[in-house]
Design a protein with these regions (language model features):
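Solvent-exposed loop/turn segments connecting transmembrane beta-strands
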Residues: 17-26, 57-60, 253-261
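N-terminal periplasmic accessory domains that precede
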Residues: 1-16, 27, 31
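Feature captures outer-membrane beta-barrel proteins of Gram-negative bacteria and organelles
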Residues: 25-36, 40-44, 64-72, 227-229, ...
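Face-selective signature of the C-terminal outer-membrane beta-barrel domain
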Residues: 71-89, 111-257
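Flexible, surface-exposed loop regions and adjacent strand-edge segments
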Residues: 57-62, 96-106, 150-160, 203-212, ...
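Surface-exposed extracellular loop regions of Gram-negative outer-membrane beta-barrel proteins
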Residues: 92, 96-102, 143-145, 198-207, ...
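Periplasmic-side early beta-strands and strand-to-turn transitions of outer-membrane beta-barrels
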Residues: 10-12, 32-115
């Protein structure tokens, strides 16, 4: 199980670094924005397309990604975190005149591809004496595009034999409460998600002496909601940690999935600290997708 978190930007002064690797180049900058805020910015771009072109490969990938994080400490009990992630990926073709027969075959079948995605969100936390509240709102989107022309000649629209565009969009909201009650930590919350998937596909498929035209547009809107509660504690001089949780999820994809009680997911885990560097772990549960 992995857990990734963006680190906070520096609060003392501005700084940054510039990196050059074997396949990409990157820039990072961070520093304070006033007395109560810090920001972290980064951008990276690959130059694999130049390497692939130099060694004569028929495809030319280019990757770009961006990150942004700002943390605002409103006061001792309230803080706001804003994040942004984005990426633009392009998969071009190396249309040189001196390609081999094998490369020409690959070029005749590989489509041009582009993909971009982003995630933006904000997290607000309010701290109390024995716990804190968390409110999270976010939006993410993924766009995929692939197309192909006969002999890679896009001078005529009639040469188009494949055109595919899909989009996935999700708007999410989550509210959580975390409480410390004696030796127990209790966490509970609710979530709601509004999602939409669209697909536009055009393709000419040769079948014998005939050509079948596939041309359709589809859309799938979806709403999801859920709730969870979890409690954990440590016993035996904090060597044994026990955790029990219960989660329920539902959505409007079909009537059989709209009742939270029909998708109850109990979970249990235990971790025993054998030494300072070794521990034994046990996990079990029921999961729904």
């Amino acid at each position: 199980v992995f857990s990734f978190e963006q680190r906070d930007g520096r609060t003392d002064k501005w700084g940054g670094n510039f990196t050059v690797g074997s396949s990409d180049i990157g820039l990072t900058a961070e520093g304070p924005l006033g007395e109560k805020s810090s920001v972290l910015l980064s951008a990276r771009r690959s130059y694999l397309q130049f390497l692939f072109d130099a060694i004569g490969l028929p495809f030319l990938p280019t990757y770009n990604d961006f990150q942004y994080k700002q943390k605002i400490k409103i006061n001792q009990k309230n803080e706001l975190t804003i994040i942004g992630l984005g990426a633009i990926d392009e998969f071009g073709l190396n249309l040189q005149d001196d390609t081999s027969a094998f490369q020409q075959y690959i070029l005749g079948n590989l489509p041009f591809q582009t993909q971009w995605n982003y995630t933006i969100g904000a997290s607000y936390k309010h701290y109390r004496e024995r716990g804190y509240s968390t409110i999270v709102a976010s939006r993410n989107m993924l766009n995929n595009r692939a197309y192909k022309y006969i002999d890679n000649d896009d001078s005529k629209e009639s040469n188009l034999i494949f055109d595919y565009t899909s989009r996935e969009m999700e708007n999410k909201f989550r509210y959580e409460e975390t409480l410390d009650i004696k030796r127990f930590r209790v966490k509970g919350g609710i979530n709601y998600e509004l999602a939409r998937y669209t697909n536009n596909t055009y393709q000419l498929i040769p079948v014998g002496t005939d050509v079948i035209t596939v041309d359709y547009q589809s859309e799938l809107p979806l709403q999801k909601w859920g709730a969870f509660v979890q409690s954990s504690t440590s016993i035996f001089d904090y060597r044994l940690t026990l955790s029990f949780g219960l989660r329920a999820d539902a959505n409007n994809y079909s009537t059989s999935m709209q009742n939270l009680l029909d998708q109850l997911s109990p979970r249990f885990s235990a971790s025993y600290k054998l030494t300072d560097t070794w521990s034994a772990n046990f996990n079990t549960g029921i999961y729904y997708q």
